[in-house]
């Protein structure tokens, strides 16, 4: 290992999957009563089935046109690209190309299917170059379809972005709070920085967001009752990778520390989002550098957090390391447990490199087992970690509640804005359960890349839209 390499803190992620899963299952044997969890979750699932989401909701759209079908892929590709098209003629051509590849004639007779089929049949009828659509009427028809599609895309966008600005987002958050006792973690939309100019722009965006949140935060109350912010380290430095470790520590850490200071002064939490497996060790080094500063300058602040991915083969070892860090620096950490959003990329990278194993679990049920094993481990260290469980599966939530009741450890549930509303409507009937909504904020043009990437990359495995309301099993 070269002098500039990131110190190894965790075991090799490329290990035999079967051995890891067997150990996780063994750890859960005495921790969970599966039948009891199923009984708790069953009425939540039935309530969601009895009160399905509206026809225009993303869950309905994906059920009608799943992204594993040609129709679903065409709609998602169109949604991702349409708002970035500079002129109407190109938009018409794009609509013609994408919708012309799919066949929606087999749709059912639901309202959504009828509306979608009508719009798409109309667009096919007026495709540029078609006999019926070659004249002015045809072009007007095609433009009408494009306009309608744009409106539909914007409607979908509003389901996943809380607001295009922080002011809009906080206004929407106030409306949501009237319906349920929830708080929010705001995420400023955008991909990783490509230049330092990008990084400084993202830094300012995060700083402005913290200022907005701070204006409404209770400075003397419980931190968990305030809204918070999520940040992406790759957005704050353009070469966030092990080969540039020293530059990361010299430049990125001070940038993140300025955000931490502002968050601590406002009594809000700041969570570092999870990224790719090969960046995890570097993220831990950044986290430890921040903990050194927190211990000295704001030891009373308990809002520094890290998101961790259950699909990683070394997720449990990560919890052990985070626990050791928290105890070493006497700073309680927040830990957001998620399934993971980069599955396809991790699998592809391991295949391209010819690695003997994968750094993530290759089966969805293995990730589910890992998630529950990680939840058990997080609940076992309340002195060091405050767990935040992100997910929308009724069975998983019931299992977490059961394990938490045994330990008495405090925790909160989290969901993604626009997803899981039906399940959480039932879960939050218990006023003692805390929920935080992960809420993207930004322009729709930024949302679409984020949304479609997650849909296309994760639709076939454990994504947040996979079987959202049709629970066929609870374990």
Question: Positions of the model-derived regions?
Answer:
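Conserved small/polar residues in nucleotide/adenosyl-binding loops
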Residues: 472-473
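Short hydrophobic-acidic sequence motifs that mark active-site Asp/Glu residues
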Residues: 185, 230, 334
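Short hydrophobic/aromatic-rich motifs at helix boundaries and adjacent loops
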Residues: 29-32, 141-146, 181, 231, ...
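Extended, charge-enriched "interface" segments that sit outside catalytic cores
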Residues: 2-52, 58-188, 193, 199-221, ...
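Metal-dependent enolase-superfamily TIM-barrel catalytic cores that perform enediolate-based chemistry
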Residues: 162-179, 189-190, 195-276, 283-294
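Active-site capping/gating regions of soluble enzymes
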Residues: 237-271, 275-469
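N-terminal small/glycine-rich loop or linker at the start of catalytic domains
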Residues: 144-153, 232-239, 349-353
